[in-house]
């Protein structure tokens, strides 16, 4: 690619926020360098709603996962895969990118195969500490392999997980926490789709805490569980003022939520872990028990090992022990700050720039 020719990048990412938001962080970086971006995803993923709002061209292919879906799905898989590759070939022929970037999700596999067939170089980024099936396969044809955690893929380069600059630009926790007083500010996040188990237990746990000590709550429930969670809070009659309890289906401005919070109760998805380090916040991690290859436990272990988080498996979680953990965190502001500073020390805030740089290098034949 000549230096005066505009870079065109096809980004392939979808399904959940854990794939889409890191990819958007890279897209922002590439766009700031005047690259033209097009997106490959599916109609069923979160990208179908989010990407058009970013003024990025969005293309769909028809593909879904088959793992755990039974024999019939496996038998249909080759035909469906070939159809999705054919669709991706047509989209690539129309856009003519110099490089494609796979950030995970069902669209990445067919898109990477189509790019390889058209001799368009492929870059992939694996967010989790345990690689997904798609990235294990696409790594074979990729020119460069980037990864959010060390030692995930054989030829992977550890750059961290891309995080939006609005989060990485937050003041460090020692400055944010300075002068704070009053109740603990507790942020509850179960991922972009919410977490039913956390939604169900939190109101019950709060009911076991002395009413005078109950923390202020900002709780992202996921759109499907919003009303149900509100009803659970109402049933517990917690006595929290409207200003002390906010239950929302989705938080668009996560940077504001992180800036407000003293501590987080959350899953251990790769994006959540990266954002905790970037913002600098201690957390109680509750890994999703049905994550493929239990990758959320592996993701969260890095924070635990560095004193930035506690972790408890969902199978061991009760309202009583969740309440006890919250009370212990409330009682020890020095510990909260130490955990937050330990998280911040793990941040790799140049990840988006690093992935964008690799895309440009690969497009130029380096």
Provide a role label for each language-model segment:
Residues 70-99:
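An amphipathic, basic-hydrophobic alpha-helix
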Residues 36, 46, 57, 116-174:
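Active-site-proximal region of nucleotide-activated glycan assembly enzymes
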Residues 6-14, 33-80, 223-225, 315:
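Conserved nucleotide-sugar phosphate-binding/catalytic loop shared by glycosyltransferases and other
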Residues 45, 50, 54, 172-264, ...:
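Donor-nucleotide binding loops and adjacent catalytic segments primarily
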Residues 348-366:
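C-terminal alpha-helical cap of glycosyltransferases
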Residues 97-99, 251, 255-274, 281-282:
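Acidic donor-binding loop of glycosyltransferase active sites
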Residues 335-349:
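A short, well-ordered alpha-helix in the C-terminal region of glycosyltransferases
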């Amino acid at each position: 690619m000549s230096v005066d020719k505009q870079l065109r990048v096809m980004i392939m990412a979808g399904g959940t926020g854990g794939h889409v938001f890191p990819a958007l962080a890279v897209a922002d970086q590439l766009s700031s360098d005047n690259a033209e971006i097009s997106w490959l995803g599916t109609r069923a993923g979160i990208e179908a709603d989010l990407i058009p709002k970013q003024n990025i061209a969005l293309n769909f292919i028809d593909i879904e996962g088959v793992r755990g879906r039974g024999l019939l799905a496996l038998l249909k898989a080759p035909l469906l895969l070939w159809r999705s590759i054919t669709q991706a070939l047509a989209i690539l022929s129309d856009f003519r990118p110099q490089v494609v970037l796979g950030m995970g999700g069902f669209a990445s596999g067919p898109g990477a195969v189509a790019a390889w067939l058209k001799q368009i170089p492929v870059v992939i980024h694996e967010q989790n500490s345990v690689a997904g099936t798609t990235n294990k396969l696409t790594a074979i044809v990729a020119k460069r392999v980037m990864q959010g955690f060390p030692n995930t893929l054989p030829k992977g380069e550890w750059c961290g997980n891309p995080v939006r600059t609005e989060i990485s630009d937050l003041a460090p926790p020692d400055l944010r926490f300075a002068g704070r007083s009053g109740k603990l500010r507790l942020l509850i996040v179960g991922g972009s789709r919410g977490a039913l188990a956390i939604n169900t237990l939190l109101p019950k746990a709060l009911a076991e805490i002395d009413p005078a000590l109950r923390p202020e709550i900002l709780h992202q429930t996921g759109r499907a569980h919003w009303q149900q969670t509100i009803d659970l809070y109402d049933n517990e009659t917690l006595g929290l003022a409207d200003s002390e309890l906010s239950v929302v289906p989705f938080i668009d401005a996560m940077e504001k939520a992180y800036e407000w919070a003293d501590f987080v109760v959350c899953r251990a998805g790769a994006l959540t872990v990266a954002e905790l380090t970037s913002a600098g916040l201690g957390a109680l991690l509750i890994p999703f028990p049905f994550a493929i290859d239990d990758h959320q436990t592996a993701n969260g272990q890095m924070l635990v090992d560095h004193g930035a988080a506690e972790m408890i498996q969902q199978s061991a979680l009760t309202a009583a022990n969740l309440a006890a953990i919250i009370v212990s965190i409330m009682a020890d502001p020095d510990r909260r700050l130490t955990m937050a500073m330990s998280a911040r020390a793990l941040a790799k805030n140049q990840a988006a720039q690093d992935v964008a740089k690799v895309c440009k290098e690969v497009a130029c034949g380096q």
